[in-house]
């Protein structure tokens, strides 16, 4: 029994010794800076260059009802204390002048007498009291100080808005007869208490150097990006094909409605590089489409056949999927699309999708074989209507007037009536008395 008690005592002594060694090693860094006589006591302001930058533009600190923390954070380094003596560190704020301030025309100017302050708030550092070695081992931060404009207790510092203050640090020796060891202040830490930042330069500095302001910065940048309009020159005729958010990277091989002599004023601002499919996703256009297509219009067609979308008005709209656009050539072809002259009236209607072709059968059924329209590839033309309701995707049967030849590079379409649908009127197109064939102009890239 005696042996067991002896073992427990040795274990306890070893634990206490280990803990004391940990405490001693922690305070050793502070002891090296100590002076039992306190004659070499010195206090240094940390981040002095940062404080100086704020002082040059007259620093401001926010005060709120619930209290707001300071930035820059007041941080000091102390040396010359008695390592084995107990000290408490206190912080208060003293007015620097005898008037209040106002921000006028980009600068702070005096604005009358100050408010009478009947209160005196002092902040006690939460590590107080502690050994001198503890205070000297590392910089001392007053990061938990909160500034308020309402006297509500809770250890917050009450300040009057639009008054200038200077922080003061006090070191008090405790453990016996309390006595003041030192008090000091730093002119570069002066600031004006405000309920909202007045100087934009102060706001910029706070955001730049305060790591906790990064969330505010990110939110501000996002809102700024939302406010930026997509600027397009007024001299340009911009016509995008809004097929599921895709734009053509090689649009000069796509047919355009209108007279062969008509050309767009300036090239479309499209990027030069090409992707594998010959078109580039441009999600930014999705939010600007007047009538976005449903997802069914982006059906990917890997076969040489042509997709037909039939609307309630018996108009057939023919276009190919994105994979077929790879066959578009960068040089215009004279045989891209040839349109026969018809004696029927042509009524171009408004459409948010310019430069598209529609095939209509006014007779309500097949009207007999019409002239063939040849394209160099299945995706060499786009056919669309001004309005689409109840889209249904189907493969074009040969009996419907659309003939798909065996050659993948050749598509023949037989129609009875061609109707040009474009957002721009084109002179010399169709009409009674006209003759000959009209080839649509190529879309400039």
From Swiss-Prot:
InterPro entries tied to this protein: p53-like_TF_DNA-bd_sf, T-box_DNA-bd, T-box_sf, TF_Brachyury, TF_T-box, TF_T-box_CS
GO molecular function, one term: RNA polymerase II cis-regulatory region sequence-specific DNA binding
Database matches in Gene3D superfamilies: Transcription factor, T-box
DNA-binding region: 45-218
A Gene Ontology term for the protein's cellular component: chromatin
Chief place of localization: nucleus
Disulphide linkage map: none
Superkingdom of origin organism: Eukaryota
Pfam families, alphabetized: T-box (PF00907)
Protein name: T-box transcription factor TBX19
Underlying gene: TBX19
